[in-house]
């Protein structure tokens, strides 16, 4: 770092650089000391950097002009942070041959050798349309797969808080003077940012969906990290206490579903054509989930790291390329159909279904909220079940439109599917029936056994061959599952709100009992997104949420959970005296002054020995005592009772983790702004669903008012004093009675980008772009003339004069002007060749929409006129 006074202004300049060699630092010092016009050059550099940043944000439609200036700034900020996490394309959908060639070579050396001439004959710059043409006219499945999932993204920085010791990541943003195409991110982060990106780059959706599916595992989970070169996973280090492995659940389903839904709205052919194409790979993550008996015995410790397999893969990467991280058969990547990939993802969740509870968290990781880390093992997620309900309903809609009557899938998957289907059929519930705890246990055991059998067959070996599954079989099974889910959802509607998580008790009995936890914001968000709550009922849920203990009046927003008081230290670990008096073991130990398990403190309270930090330690001590001759019979009679008393005193199974004990981050009293934005999006989706259902105006107004009530709690509607930070910057969370914390790199930005485009009424249906800003506030239209600055499809900074009663934004870098008019709704499309086409109605044709989505440059500007009566708010 260096500094210098600017004599003419009295300003003090600080110059900071990173990643410089000694010679580069010396050269820089020389320039600073010898250059006469150094300040002018610095100003030029700042101006260029600002222009470059504007162009990056503008290329992702981050520039808007409306009467709400702070909202415009917030949209800019959201867009900036979204592309910083997920990256952005360099020039629309253009691909550099040099980077593409290097990508193929790094991925699979054999494929590169085979396709070298084809690649060399490509133009230096070509677009994604050319790449897709290569896919459709080639018979090499490896090349097709690699082409489909290629993403030439730049500017991506992996999300991760560096203060957390387990977060290890690279930040690669330049490569000398050339563009560096690179992306890296946690699976659970980067795909959600790509969901925001594809609004501006819809033609990239097939690549992102392919990258998602190609990286899922045989047992239906996903690796920890994604980067340009493929996948990566956490490696167990026996000497590192932070070293840990596992799989998340909910992210997988809802992130993939949103991408599939987006593709279905834009162009259904990719999904329909891919369902029976064997062009998708499988990640070979060296994690082995234990068998069903081990999981039932200890659901907190269920995954082993295969060190030998990991080392073999690392060695094979040097020989084969990064494709060696995929499932291979004799050094060849094994390919399956999209139908199989989707079926395995679904079956892995359905195999962990616990009726009336949700999806079992038995893969050593929590879900979206890391602070619920202690739910792992005995926690059950209704959140994932709600999302899975929407996912399965969507899959059935897709299957209803396919031409094929059957798909080809692996023998092992087909057997797993059919046996699982029969098990679900055997336990088909009556309407609103809550399953008996004994029957629930046998249902769960059977599902676990089937999943375990499948895993043990497929770990360390490729499929034994292919078989056929009828489409109608899948549809019928999905309908059966949805009936099970409907019961569980209805049974988790408690006191006007829905459960997010439950806990189970499976220790040493033939029953599985389900216990409800306290309400969480996450539960309301996911159920409102599930497709099971109709718009009118959603109004009731949202009103109940505003009346609940989760609502924090000072911030006009919602905490993750109701704020609760904690027991004081001395109030914990107290065994009721009546239990002690009824226990022969407790009385015998106290009489002998044996404090290994129980002792009486100076205040006369009975407590468990402080060293018994969990039930496993207690079991070990009880086992020792059972070897004592005089206590042997007592132990036989009372061991299970003592364990039950221990669990009653400490209630470990209902302990959620940091969320129940800490006050910062995602802890007690904390508002997590990402979840509030998810609530905003769920409410907006229900508003548009109400429009599709032709709901009455009162329902629309109620949902819209609730939407804006939620919106008013977010930062762009607050003062710095209220927010505790700059309102136009996204922040992670706000602890109770404090200001916003952790700026910038939050997943919240994706939801805010999507909801902003929803407010503007940009909706796609079957390939046609519709303009229906029924949710937009009429106060957003300008009250006086202004200028809209934007980046056009030629990457040029442009200005557009706006009048009173207008506003402007871009869509795929084409400026869209909305105008209030008395002449009815109409659309005027201005083409680059000075042709103007007028449309009566609210939508563009498929051809026009395709020109926008493909960023062809044919459309120069679109103007849409609305009557004031169109707007409700």
What residue ranges belong to the model's regions?
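Acidic, mature catalytic/reactive cores of soluble proteins
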Residues: 1-873
